[in-house]
Amino acid sequence: MITKKIFFILLFAITSILSQTYFPDYGNWKRKKPNQVGFNQKKLNKAIQYAIDSESSGSRNLTEFIKATLTKEPHGEIIGPTKDRGDMTGLIIKNGFIVSEWGDINRVDMTFSISKTYLSTVIGVALDKGLIQNVNDKVQIYVPTEHFESEHNSKITWDHLLRQTSHWKGTLWDKPDWADRPPKNVAWTELQNQPMHEPGKNWKYNDVRVNLLAFSGLQVWRKPLPQVLKENIMDPIGASNTWRWHGYE
C-alpha cells in the first residue's frame, strides 16, 4: 500500500510538472509581457536599445564587407553565396514565450559561424547513430583520402577537428591551410613554413580545417549535411523551413 501511495504521489508530481511545461506549436509562439517572466522592463528596454545601437559599422553589402575583411589574406576569394543584411533585429525568448522583439524577425539573414554549431551537431548525430564509433578514432579510418595520408595528418582524430586542434596541413577546395588568418607582418612566401604543432596540442581557429570537418562528415553520411540537419534536428524540433545552409559554389 505504501509503495502504491509513493508511486501515485511521484506520478502526480511528474504529471503536474509536465502540465506546466510549455512548448510552442510550429509557427505559433505565444507571447508574455516581460514582467510576467521576471524581467525588469526598464532594464530590458535599455539592453534592447544597446543592441540596436551596437550595429556593425561595416557595409550592409556583405560581398563588399567580406572582401574588405579579407584583403590581407591570400586566397580570400568568396566561393559561396552572400546576402545583404537588413536592419538590426532581435528576439528575446524566456521559457518558450516571446517577451520582446525588434526589427523584421521574419527576415532571413546570414549568420556565419553558427554553421559550426550545425556542423558539430551533425557529427554528433553520426556518432549517436554509430556511423562514427568514437571521437578519438583517427579520421583516416573513415575518410581514406589523400587529405589524411601524410604522417602528420594521419594522426588527426575527430576530436581534434571538432576542437580545432588538428593543425591539419594541406589544401582544400583550392584554399591552403596557411592562408586562413595568417599572422601579421609575415610575407606570404614565408607563411607556408610556419611551425606545425602535433594534432591535439595547440588550438588555432582556421576555417580551412573547419571545412575539412565538413568534408569528412560528408564522407561518413554520404548525403548533403543540410539534409542530415533537416531530417535529424530541424524537423523534429519544429523549426521553420526558411533556413538555409549553403555550401561552396
Where are these regions (language model features)?
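Active-site SXXK
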Residues: 40, 96, 110-135, 161, ...
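Sec-dependent N-terminal signal peptides
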Residues: 5-15
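N-terminal leader/targeting segments and the immediately adjacent pre-domain N-terminus
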Residues: 17-104, 129-132
